[in-house]
Structure formats: structure tokens, C-alpha cells
């Protein structure tokens, strides 16, 4: 989503074109929050209409980390429009929900958020797994959660609902 924060849809188009015909298969999730917060100044303001046509691209997999968990939980119309558009195209919605619990977590997942990469400990990951989410285990420069979440990988019960990511 960073390139969209700077360049808007031109940035998304650039990334799709720049990764064509590479020896690796590069897939994309569309930015959910551009700008990242209502107070941010950004190179663009992308609503669901701005990104909708990108869902038809074969390498676009869905909507990236829905960072506006407050808007998701409270049914903010702009957030709901983005979620509904992604679902209408039969695409996934990745999450970004640190420390959500209880009814807030239930509402967030019920909105259709498929996964989360913000689990820093096993308890948070287990809550989300039991509610049906997939867990992205981060091991990168900003966060290192592999050691804390290793029991999920070792578990016969949960390893198939886990994946690795750098952010």
C-alpha cells in the first residue's frame, strides 16, 4: 500500500506492469487504507471505486491489511464499500488487528477479514484461529514473531492455517 500512498492508482499500475513476465510469480493485494489514517496527507485518496477495476487483474488476490479495524467494526460506509467490493469479486481480505478481543474481534472477522499478521503472542493467534482466521507469522525487520508463534507450526491442528510473511 505504500506505493499507492505516494502515487495512487498509478503506483498500483506501475507495480503490476513492472512485475510482469518475471521468473517469480508476484501477486498483489490492493490497498485498503489510502491514506493510512484520516489525518495523513497522501498522494491519493482511494475509495472502492478507485481500486475496483484492479480486482479483474489475474495477479490481484484481494484487499490488503484492513488497518481501519475501528471502521470495520463500526460499519463505516467507506470501509464497508471496500469489503463488499472485494467480496463481490470473490477475493480475500487480509487483516491488521492488533489487540482486538471479544465482540470487537468477532465483528471484525464477521465482516469477512480472512487473515491477520499482527499476532505477537500465541494467545492472540489462538483467539483468531478459533474464530476462523488464518495467521500470517511475521519474521522481518519490523516484527519478529516466529519464535513466539512456533507452537502453531509444530501443531498438527493449526499448521495448515498458518503462513509466513515479512510484514
Stretches with model-predicted labels:
Residues 65-167:
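Active-site core of metal-dependent hydrolases
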Residues 1-90:
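Divalent-metal coordination cores built from histidine and acidic residues
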